[in-house]
Amino acid sequence: NRQTDGNLAAVYQMLRAQGESAAHILTRDLAGTTVSAFDANIEYSSILGEAPDLGVAFQTDPVGTQLERVAKIIASRQEFGVNRQIFLVGAYGYDTHSAQPTSLPNLHSRLDAGVSAFSESMKNMGIFNRVTLATASDFGRTLADNGDGTDHGWGGHQFVVGGAVNGGSLYGDIPPPSFEHGQDA
């Protein structure tokens, strides 16, 4: 809105002045760094505003929105002047100690839709063989049900998607398909 834009413009001008004239070196440095961040954000937004159509509709949930932004950056890679990039996208809500039977299918559906749209956008750009998407997590889940969900465990399932992925294999040791064994959490 105009009020916010006006306030940001005033803050920007104040920081620019502080970066040039503040008495303390740390004040000048902080102001200069913040002005550089403002400038980079303006350029970033301008480039993304001109990004080509991805040819696929992404969902508007957090995963879909983030993956769409990554796809637009990749589509605009020449304008950004970079050949190799690593992006981190966050997907939250998987700590399902309770209500797992109703929440987990929705989470999986969102992840599936986001990864599918992202993969299709890479195919539409003709670069599916040059882009790899991988999942990672800091914890896994137990196989045993706690009555309404699962608790923290030793590992979890991860996957890798991309045209260059040589799929069809499982990596790591598969625990016995039973409870109360030495590898059970």
Predicted regions and their residues:
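A structural signal for short secondary-structure junctions
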Residues: 81, 126-129, 150-154, 163-165, ...
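Metal-dependent active-site segment of extracytoplasmic phospho-/sulfohydrolases and closely related
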Residues: 122-147
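Structural beta-strand/beta-sheet cores of well-ordered domains, especially the beta-sheet scaffolds
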Residues: 85-87, 129-135, 154-157
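Histidine-centered active-site microenvironments of extracellular/periplasmic hydrolases
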Residues: 139-169
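Feature for exported/extracytoplasmic and membrane-associated proteins, marking the mature portion
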Residues: 1-112, 117-124, 160, 169-185
